[in-house]
Regions:
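OB-fold and OB-like single-stranded nucleic-acid-recognition modules
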Residues: 2-71
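Conserved ASCE/P-loop NTPase catalytic core
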Residues: 58-264
């Protein structure tokens, strides 16, 4: 490569002393370590997968392997397994693309292991990005532009949904987000792309990922006497983009509580 020094007179004037930035112009790049080498399937792995696929109980075995440290919640484990495996995206006539990823929303009472499910997916999925509704903004989830402090040029930076491309994006405390921030992810959840036009930069970023989010109901407890949409502070457009809605209720059941205590 070529080693150069980048000199910016305006930056030097502002700081009051010479400032040089090191720039290395590469002529060739040789990749030494492959981060995904451990995930590549060998012929033995493929034969073992085909053997497992012929098992009539493979579905139950997969669901049972989801978060084994959490007792019960078979419906949630089924939804998470479906989201991790995903579906098949379709390109209709080369003009309209239908996403294959499955978006899941977990809504339930406090202390029902919703966040633990998200943490399990974060550690299990090949590519997973974790974010919280209270600490994430529209720019942090989608994309934004910033000015480089040295070159003073505008650069494009992807958010959590872009970084989770071909993976899973996990959002905890989804109901704590601002309405404007939630509106910004409508395109990413349905079209799986993010369009940005700021500071002279016009681009479309890929966000081909499944979204698994967790939220708390209004007033802390789920009310079964009213519809799902009235139990959570989410608008109808955002709810319609979730394929699976899971409700987790903390019911008083002495038998289940005793079985849970024995499991722990």
């Amino acid at each position: 490569g070529i080693y150069r020094n980048n000199f910016d007179a305006a930056l030097n004037t502002r700081h009051g002393f010479p400032v040089f930035a090191t720039v290395l112009e590469a002529n060739h790049i040789a990749k030494r370590d492959d981060a995904y080498a451990a995930f590549r399937l060998t012929e033995d792995d493929e034969q073992e997968i085909r053997a497992l696929a012929r098992d009539d109980r493979i579905g139950k075995r997969i669901i049972k392997s989801m978060a084994p440290s959490i007792y019960g919640h078979q419906s949630i484990k089924t939804a998470i397994a479906l989201s991790l495996f995903g579906g098949v995206s379709k390109d209709v006539g080369g003009k309209h693309r239908i996403r294959g990823d499955i978006n899941v929303l977990l809504l339930g009472d406090p202390g029902t292991a919703k966040s633990q499910f998200l943490k399990y997916v974060e550690k299990t999925a090949n590519r997973a990005v974790f974010a919280t509704g209270q600490g994430a903004s529209a720019v942090g989830l989608t994309a934004g532009v910033r000015r480089d402090p040295v070159t003073r040029e505008w650069t494009l930076e992807g958010g959590a949904l872009v970084l989770a491309d071909k993976g899973v994006c996990l959002i905890d405390e989804f109901d704590k987000m601002n309405d404007a921030d939630r509106t910004s992810i409508h395109e990413a959840m349905e079209q799986q792309s993010i369009s940005i036009s700021k500071a002279g930069i016009v681009a479309t970023l890929q966000a081909r990922c499944a979204i698994v989010a967790a939220a708390n109901p209004i007033r802390g407890r789920y009310n079964p006497t009213v519809p799902f949409s009235q139990n959570v502070e989410l608008t109808e457009p955002i709810l319609s983009r979730f394929d699976v809605l899971c409700v987790v209720k903390d019911l008083v059941d002495p038998v289940q509580d005793e079985m849970l205590a024995r499991f722990v």
